[in-house]
Amino acid sequence: MSKVILVTGISSGFGKKIAEFLSQKGHAVYGTIRTDCSVAPNVRVLKMDLTDVTSIKNAVNTVIREEGHIDVLINNAGMHLGGPIEEAPVELFTRQMNANFNGLVHIIQAALPHMRANGGGTIINFSSIGGLMGLPFQPFYSSSKFAIEGLSEALRMELKPFNIRVVVINPGDFHTSNTTNRINITVPGGPYEEQFKKSIAIIGKDETGGWEPEILARKICKIVDKRNPRNRYIIASFEQKLAVVLKKILPIGLFSKILESHYGIK
């Protein structure tokens, strides 16, 4: 059955492939972008900035005006900031939280009245493996994803009476534009520079050696079609799934040593 789906952040990576694959399956797909770019021909493009509440409301209202309802909201859009906590400019980590978390809250708030009126629906929130464990030199990215985890847990319970399901997606390392688009900050000659360069090189290698975004997009298409999707889908390599399990069962000090070793921290 065809559904009306709103996907945020379709200019590249996950969002672009998700919108493309969903439209190929016959769904009415609306996708948001900040700047002009090429997208699949059957996707309705909406200009939206996650840091601009008015643009968020306008995007949702456009879908409602043209389709009458929203069946599925996929919150994929965001940004990625890398660098040590001490040296992060306040405007950048504020921008990180505004884009990844506050913007997600605003679009959920805008869509929910319409989803309730429609008798239900599905909200798919993109977290990350970094939303299940703090990652060195990605502290604000991890923080924004941890916030999405907590929000989704609470939201799931609040929306149960309205037949609105909340699904969290935890991608592992994927080969997307996230690596080149990440904003990396460190003070030249500062106390973190050497370690940051070493760790961020490892992070970049993990990402460029990761899976292609088509794998995740196909999984999202299957989730959209499910009547009762699971609360969480960890879409990652065996090693990354194992890390999630190990964090739950190991003492935090021992688990931290494993991460420190992986990221070359001594």
Model-derived segments and spans:
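Active-site helix of classical SDR
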Residues: 108, 144-147
